[in-house]
């Protein structure tokens, strides 16, 4: 079972590390190509491209310029410990055991606009480059055209290595769009998380993102390998709703808190 999640805009390079083990990203040559393009942008162009403030644009211009591919624990951090958004609040990788990191390294992948695909222990230097960014490269008008089938090929390698053909898509639509489902050698399971508000169940972004992290952690902690095992997920009050689920879409609900 291979879990896919999105990265986060919020990064943490200060907290104590939960592990000293690390690996190197597998698509650094591609990342270098994107860095070369991004370095040619002015602060103002970055601000417009990413719809961010001039202060954030300046920070990201500095990150692009400081980026250099000789990643060490001194200038980079393991991806699963560097990302700090809502998904990662649910995941809580900082409390993983060594065995959890082992399982996650084989069964969890983070999709990334800059790095393509990251394993949990892959070192990464700080960046901001969301998959939906319309950064033109020699390969096309945006990052989807840049990555083409590369991400899918890398995921297929991971699927083959772990020996089963199930992908649990816990990534956002923006990121999963970089994957070619028809060329993925796997059955794709898509969990959906609905929270009750005023008597109606609906997707509430903050809760849904955190739930993706909670389910990722649940799979890792329980060493799940089969899709049917996912229906037992019950973290923080969620429960499987068979009546609302259909095909490969698994619906989980939670009553108003």
Curated annotation (Swiss-Prot):
Organism: Cronobacter sakazakii (strain ATCC BAA-894)
PANTHER family listed in its UniProt record: PEROXIDE STRESS RESISTANCE PROTEIN YAAA, PEROXIDE STRESS RESPONSE PROTEIN YAAA
GO biological-process terms attached to the record: response to hydroperoxide
Protein name: UPF0246 protein ESA_03332
InterPro entries: YaaA
GO annotations of cellular component type: cytosol
Domain of life: Bacteria
Pfam families assigned to the protein according to its UniProt record, in alphabetical order: H2O2_YaaD (PF03883)
Family label: Belongs to the UPF0246 family.
């Amino acid at each position: 079972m291979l879990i896919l999640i999105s990265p986060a805009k919020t990064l943490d390079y200060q907290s104590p590390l939960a592990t000293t083990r690390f690996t190197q990203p597998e698509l650094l040559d591609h990342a270098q190509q994107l860095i070369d393009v991004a370095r040619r942008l002015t602060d103002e162009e970055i601000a417009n491209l990413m719809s961010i403030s001039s202060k954030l644009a300046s920070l990201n211009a500095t990150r692009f310029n400081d980026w250099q591919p000789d990643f060490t624990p001194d200038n980079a951090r393991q991806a699963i410990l560097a990302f700090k958004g809502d998904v990662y609040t649910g995941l809580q990788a900082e409390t993983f055991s060594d065995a959890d990191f082992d399982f996650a390294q084989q069964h969890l992948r983070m999709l990334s606009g800059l790095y393509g695909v990251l394993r949990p222990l892959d070192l990464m230097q700080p960046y901001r480059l969301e998959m939906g960014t319309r950064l033109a490269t020699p390969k096309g008008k945006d990052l989807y055209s840049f990555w083409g089938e590369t991400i899918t090929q890398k995921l297929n390698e991971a699927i083959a290595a772990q020996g089963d053909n199930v992908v649990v898509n816990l990534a956002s639509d923006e990121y999963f769009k970089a994957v070619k489902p028809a060329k993925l050698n796997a059955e794709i399971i898509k969990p959906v998380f609905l929270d009750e508000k005023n008597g109606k169940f609906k997707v509430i972004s903050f809760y849904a993102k955190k739930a993706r992290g909670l389910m990722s952690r649940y799979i890792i902690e329980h060493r799940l390998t089969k899709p049917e095992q996912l229906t037992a997920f019950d973290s923080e009050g969620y429960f499987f709703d068979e009546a609302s689920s259909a095909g490969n879409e698994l619906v989980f609900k939670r009553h108003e808190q």
